[in-house]
């Protein structure tokens, strides 16, 4: 993944994992299926937390709140790996379609003509900005600062919308 999505091949994965190319091909019919499986694996904890938050309220603004909490309460190793894969895929636009759809779905239904909707959108964007800055290595954000950032997002953007 260090060399981009073009270098992410079944052969490369087999060599890195110390297994046969046939073993990888048995599990994954294509490079796309392998990438999808990687995202599903790394996204598992996120989705569980997201679904827990929206279980009783699936409104658009609560889905944004769920995204914020799921991003905040993350597994660092999984997110770091997911960010590495995302960075590799940025070099190959055809793999970005499902990611674009995922982002659109997260903000679907947020009414940005209202103060609450505008705050929800800002909270979402602040969350994504913090994630990208931390996991793409563009800014050193330690665990304490990570907690402070999400406390600020919650108190300045999320909690205000529910008052």
Where are these regions (language model features)?
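Hydrophobic/aromatic-rich alpha-helical bundle segments in the mid-to-C-terminal region
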Residues: 93-100, 104-163
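Alpha-helical structural segments
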Residues: 2, 16, 33-56, 62-70, ...
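Amphipathic alpha-helical interaction elements
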Residues: 5, 26, 55, 87-91, ...
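Generic structural signal for hydrophobic core residues of well-folded globular domains
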Residues: 38, 71, 89-90, 130, ...
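Helix-turn-helix
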Residues: 2-33
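Helical hydrophobic small-molecule/effector-binding pocket
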Residues: 52-97
